[in-house]
């Protein structure tokens, strides 16, 4: 979309040679089941809000990318900077996770924001990259976690942690969400 996408329900299975779901400005997912089986980047928009739903992403580059949309698979992958040092730092870019369950398997950064990331609820599991040129988490400003369930795995070459103002990690392990996680959802083949 050249502007905004709002997903409030439904079941989607997507495969793309570029972005699975792309909005230039705003992407809001409130509910539904989204299975992106193949893509360059899974979700991309300047401002991404995940409030609910079950999302599974398999991406050759970034799984979720809060960016101004300048990256593209045309001409090959873009070259990223070090952790928090992406080439397009923009404090207006954001990823907010308030609910839902999200599973990301990414060849590039698992989740990437050229601005900030905030997680207040839901479940996020990132099966990140194995090469040292990317990381499970990549953000330029901060990543604050005040609730939810967070697991990130990937290479340590560009590893970033959540910001110091976040709640202690042990609090995330108290309980799993009642809804099935995306990798537990069976899709038609």
Predicted regions located by residue number:
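A composition-driven surface/loop motif
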Residues: 1-189
């Amino acid at each position: 979309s050249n502007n905004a996408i709002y997903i409030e329900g439904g079941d989607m299975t997507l495969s793309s040679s570029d972005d699975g779901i792309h909005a230039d400005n705003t992407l809001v997912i409130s509910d539904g089941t989204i299975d992106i089986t193949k893509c360059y980047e899974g979700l991309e928009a300047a401002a991404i809000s995940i409030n609910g739903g079950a999302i599974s992403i398999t991406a050759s580059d970034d799984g979720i990318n809060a960016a101004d949309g300048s990256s593209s698979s045309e001409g090959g992958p873009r070259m990223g900077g070090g952790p928090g040092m992406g080439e397009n730092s923009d404090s207006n870019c954001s990823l907010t996770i308030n609910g839902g369950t999200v599973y990301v398997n990414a060849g590039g950064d698992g989740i990437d924001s050229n601005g900030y990331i905030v997680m207040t609820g839901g479940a996020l599991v990132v099966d990140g990259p194995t090469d040292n040129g990317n990381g499970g988490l990549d953000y330029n400003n901060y990543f604050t976690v005040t609730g939810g369930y967070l697991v990130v795995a990937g290479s340590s070459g560009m590893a970033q942690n959540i910001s110091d103002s976040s709640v202690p990690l042990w609090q995330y392990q108290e309980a799993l969400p009642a809804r099935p996680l995306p990798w537990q959802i069976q899709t038609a083949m």
